[in-house]
Amino acid sequence: MGKYNTHALALELALRAVPMLRVLELGQGRYSTPLLMQRCQERGLVSVENNPKYYRPSAGAWMQTRLVREWEEMWPWVLACGSYGVALVDHAPALRRAVDLARLRDHVWLMVVHDTESAEYGYAGIREQWRWRWDDRGRRPWTGLWTNREGVAAAVGLAAIASGLTLTREQGQG
């Protein structure tokens, strides 16, 4: 497993913990986008990218995609699509992730946050906004799972046990 797909196990766990609700992907990738295209045909996928090199167009009616120049352009469209069961946050530039996580907080049941061990992403200033937080520290870069929903937190715990994935729990305020 290379450094670009260390989020795959946590993402799979999130999809099991929150089934059948639409997924949001911020930052398409060589590994995450094909995985989500395979797993989200029944639930729907909204995927946004700002780099033409990584952008993949829609694969069907169940998938909506946008290539944006600036991340701020996505907000009217992303919010018009409704709420999301899972969001993968793995886009560039680094500090944009914290801005978008804070804005998505009330629209997503479970966040999958890549690169949680690194200060360059600005997570320290916002991670306390989520009551339940875990990190998959079994591979670098780390991937976090963040939620404010008690039922989702319980589902994450059960899915982690079932999958054999060891998660490090952080105490949050929510």
Language model region names:
Residues 1-88, 92-174:
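A short alpha-helical cap/connector motif
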